[in-house]
Amino acid sequence: MINNHSKNNHNNKNSQINKNNIPGRPAKSNVTAHNEHSVDTRELALEMFIEINERGAFSHIVLRSVLDKYQYLSKQDRAFMTRLVDGTIEYMLQLDYIIDSFSKTKVRKMKPFIRNLLRMSVYQIKYMDAVPDSAVCNEAVKLAKRHKFAQLSGFVNGVLRNIARNIDSVQFDTLSIRYSMPQWIVDRFVAAYGEKKAEEIFKAFHSKSTISIRTNLTRCTPDELRATLEAEGVTVTAVDELNYAFVISGFDYLNGLQSFRDGLFYVQDISSMLVAQTAAPKKGDYVIDVCAAPGGKSTHIAELLQGSGHVLARDLTDNKVDMIEENIERHGLNNMSAEVWDATVPDADSAGKADILICDLPCSGLGVLGRKKDIRYKMTPESVDELAALQRQILDTVHTYVKPNGVLVYSTCTIDEAENEDNVRWFIEKHPEFELDKNFAEGTGMKQILPGEHGSDGFFIARFIKSKL
């Protein structure tokens, strides 16, 4: 049974995680320390991939930890490692299919080190044209020998050279293999959206991810932020739908930007920014965010309040609340506080106090599979059902916090009906004092954003009004 209902920043909010793997703080990594003058980027990438794939670590945590540790590496080396790890995760099912097509020993029967070495090598052969196939094969053999698999180095060499010679002949006849997506997810999306739309969604997952940011309006104007970023050498593109949002590129890492350290902006997907906009806080409003970490939506609301009112941001653990408090401090927000609170536990003191209640709840993350690539392998149909039940439990607990005529915003980063529309229907039926806001989303009161729309992740938002006593 899934019982960790705090958000894990990778938006696959249900997963049980090691306490050391808390987003926003350095993770204890099993990746071997390397001497500064002898870093083999392929070896380091392979060690990261093994930790993610064989030990269940979250890819974004492992990558961030290692990239922070090896900041002295060149921008090119850091980019190479990131692409190699992310790409191998993204295409893992397809890579296994290719390997199984050319190897008598199937992937599932290989030693973990060898199968992951082959996966990463085949990714380079298939998707990294700048890397010569001969170099891929030679480096893989060296790594096998270095890690005491000399007896299998010939096998590694033979399989990879055979694949390199014949890679263009491999056909991917199913959506699952073509887009490296577990069959149950393919079946679920096809049933919900039809095969054509499902394939468009899968294509969107494989499109290049962008980094979107919103201006901290308490510290600067959008024009001032743009000028500051451009002075730092960052490429800045405006977002048509939101005048305070930009897409940025052309920089090495965020902590290297003084503007980020000064709290002039917050990194947030465009769809997530719509939560605060949907909440539409008014001057003096009291807002409760029940599952707030790392604090993106609640800090956004606090900024829109322009120093008035108050935002109380809650989450399940001290580590989560520490993240929120770090963002409060970095953004200089005096009208916001954070505290530890389990959203499934009723709080009598909060009953009837909230002008706005934000319920951005733990979810399957099936809308962000392009950005958080390992979710597809961690999630199961059973865990989706458990999460939908958890969402209902939390809604059932916290709805009492809303004042009469107050607003409840329910949001997820999934595009799964069981967690979205089904929960909305259930909530209205059980709590008839709440109605969908007919002034939101063309009269429907709820909005499903599919991956790729507006250049954003998949997301769902519903706006309720507590209109009856």
PLM regions with names:
Residues M1-L469:
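S-adenosylmethionine
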